[in-house]
Amino acid sequence: KQLASKMAESLLCLAADKQFNACGVCHSCQIMQAGNHPDHLTIRSEEAGKSIKIDQIRALKEKQSLTPSVANWKTVVIESADLMTNSAANSLLKLLEEPQNNTILILTTNAVHRLPVTIRSRCQQMHLSTPDYSMTLKWLDSQGVATDADQLRKISSLTLDAPFAIVNALETNEWQSYQQIQQDFDQLIQQQANPVQLA
């Protein structure tokens, strides 16, 4: 999400350097940092873990019909795009098939396989590798994420050490459900549980 935001900021910057870094001081950068850039839109689920709805994509399409007013580009970041409902994804597909001029759409997801194939086939994909566990720990510490080491190790194994997935798991407590499923599955394999009771 942070990378997507930085990419959008660089695209909208009026004085980006040769390495494509936003200057941080031009008018476009300042209003982007203030969170009210007229040429940028961030779409995310309205509640943690909930779906991105078709009304949000309709609002995006309405906004994208306008020409840029400050920068040379219009940017859209859709966070956790895999949370789109089917109708929202179908609505977005039409925009991807006929993109507006000078418009960049950036979709982020921790689960690209959950995106419809029709969406994936119309996007240029960039896969970010997961950092090693020690780097993840340092980053979590810098973000002020506090939890005991044993709990963190369990969550980390369930989320494949993905830092943002760890934070999301802690915020939503979903990891406890996954841990229970893992324990039930282990008991089934070891024939220590009745499948009917677990169901």
Where do the model's predicted regions map?
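Generic recognition of short, well-ordered alpha-helical segments
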Residues: 55, 87-91, 118
